[in-house]
């Protein structure tokens, strides 16, 4: 990139320089390697027409089973979507960093087990694989790049191990982080839980070969198209508060990332009475990188809701409905004013805006009025009261806190949404253009649950109901969910640089570095 510096004393004095940005997670690591780094199956190459293509992902975390340590990552990273063989070398960095040459890589583990059956890949319940570490090749503490709770003298986040053990379940609006091969350290929040999602795969890492789809249940989605990128598959998603594992990253779209719940991943690899746990220590410190200005600003951008203004005719219709029901709406004691604007749950559709006193109990405010959605705007005290003109409504809305893409919701709301989700998820997933159904929070009614309907951009779909069995619905349109994020646009995340580590002393019983 080009950087220009201008003198504050004399604007005519300036200079430019070209700077090459190196993503720290893509570098060759000194042994023993820390995780969150680039890696791949040494056999993950495709040669066609004299051209060789190779792929790479993220060596996500360290787990233990029966006293043996394994690297945990996505199946399509370590086990080639079921095409891998037990014993395959797992190398660091991934072949994608070395122009597909084994030169410059080191074998850090050997493939042990994957989750895909090559004869029936669509039956997979998780996208995960484990590889037994080569003695001395991997940091035994489970450190992950940039996930530490402290910084070095330059202000760069140190590596840090996650909370050891079994991890925790995700909840809507839980603050999370990950450190991956492509986008480094990124921070965001859980957008939805209980996600049923259709994910596209191909048998070859370059997108060629047999195409197939896996429909997963009980998944977790993370907000932000730039929370991850191609090559971040296999990253461990952890809580920002103390790096407790939450999910294993494996796919995404241009708006969201999806991961397997860590409980499902660990249970899959339990064997012979031996359970699987994350290697780490009891940790109280936060992922300090998420409090730095760059990652913090990027997270705020990911969580900001974007308004899509309805058509003039739609707003006119909503105003007529509002006026016809003004007495009923103003009869609720918490409602200070009623206006008209945009829905955030159904972008591009109008909404009747109910300006309510923040913290005051709600008296069964309607979600729909004659087919028009309502949107609740909370504030301490609004300047205007009663029915608002278009200009007054816009001004009053701008005086309130801007809406966020996700809010925390109480367990009672989650339980209510789970009942509706279970009753209707199958029929919704069969609709043309629908690629996912989940439980999230309503943006139009903060504090209430909603069913998230993930749609595929530019694919026709039936009308989505405004609410189902009393639960509001939300629409989120995006590119196709795809493992490896093929075709995803350029990333906007700015990875935090990391200082080079000094070479560690040789481990006496370590195996020599091998070349695949």
Regions inferred by a protein language model and the residue ranges of each:
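Extracellular/luminal low-complexity segments enriched in Ser/Thr/Pro
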Residues: 1-2
């Amino acid at each position: 990139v080009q950087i220009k510096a201008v003198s504050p004393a004399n604007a005519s004095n300036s200079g430019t320089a070209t700077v090459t940005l190196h993503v720290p997670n893509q570098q060759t690591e000194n042994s023993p390697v820390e995780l969150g780094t680039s890696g791949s199956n040494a056999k993950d190459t495709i040669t066609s027409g004299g051209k060789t293509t190779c792929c790479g992902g993220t060596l996500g975390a360290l787990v233990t089973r029966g006293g043996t340590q394994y690297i945990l990552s996505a199946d399509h990273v370590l086990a080639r979507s079921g095409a891998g063989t037990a014993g395959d070398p797992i190398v660091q960095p991934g072949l994608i960093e070395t122009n597909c040459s084994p030169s410059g890589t080191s074998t850090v583990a050997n493939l042990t087990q994957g989750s895909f059956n090559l004869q029936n890949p669509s039956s997979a319940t998780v996208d995960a694989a484990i590889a037994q570490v080569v003695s001395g090749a991997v940091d035994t503490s489970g450190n992950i790049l940039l996930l530490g709770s402290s910084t070095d003298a330059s202000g760069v986040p140190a590596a840090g191990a996650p909370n050891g053990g079994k991890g925790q379940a995700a909840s809507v609006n839980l603050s999370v982080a990950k450190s991956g091969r492509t986008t480094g350290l990124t921070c965001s929040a859980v957008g939805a839980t209980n996600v049923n999602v259709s994910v596209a795969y191909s048998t070859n890492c370059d997108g060629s070969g047999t195409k197939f789809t896996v429909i997963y249940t009980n998944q977790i989605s993370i907000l932000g198209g730039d929370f991850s990128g191609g090559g971040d598959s296999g990253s461990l998603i952890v809580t920002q508060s103390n790096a407790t594992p939450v999910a294993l990253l494996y796919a995404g779209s241009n708006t969201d990332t999806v991961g397997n719940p860590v409980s499902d991943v660990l249970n899959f690899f339990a064997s012979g009475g031996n359970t699987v746990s994350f290697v780490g220590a009891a940790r109280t410190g936060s992922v300090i990188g998420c409090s730095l200005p760059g990652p913090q600003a990027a997270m705020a951008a990911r969580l900001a809701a974007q308004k899509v203004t309805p058509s003039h005719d739609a707003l006119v219709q909503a105003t007529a409905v509002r006026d016809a029901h003004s007495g009923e709406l103003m009869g609720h004691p918490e409602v200070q004013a009623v206006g008209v604007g945009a829905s955030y749950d159904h972008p591009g559709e109008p909404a009747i805006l109910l300006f309510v006193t923040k913290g005051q109990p709600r008296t069964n405010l309607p979600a729909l009025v004659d087919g028009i959605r309502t949107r609740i705007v909370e504030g301490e005290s609004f300047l205007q009261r009663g029915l608002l003109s278009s200009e007054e409504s816009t001004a009053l809305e701008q005086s309130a806190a801007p809406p966020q893409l996700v809010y925390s919701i109480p367990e009672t709301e989650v339980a209510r949404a789970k009942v509706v989700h279970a009753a209707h998820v199958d029929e919704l997933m069969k609709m043309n253009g629908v690629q996912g159904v989940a439980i999230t929070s309503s943006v139009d009614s903060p504090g209430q649950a909603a069913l998230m309907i993930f749609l595929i951009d530019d694919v026709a779909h039936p009308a989505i109901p405004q609410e189902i069995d009393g639960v509001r619905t939300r629409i989120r349109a995006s590119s196709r969910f795809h493992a490896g994020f093929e075709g995803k646009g350029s990333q906007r995340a700015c990875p935090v640089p990391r200082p080079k580590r000094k070479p560690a002393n040789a481990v006496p019983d370590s195996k020599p570095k091998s070349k695949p």
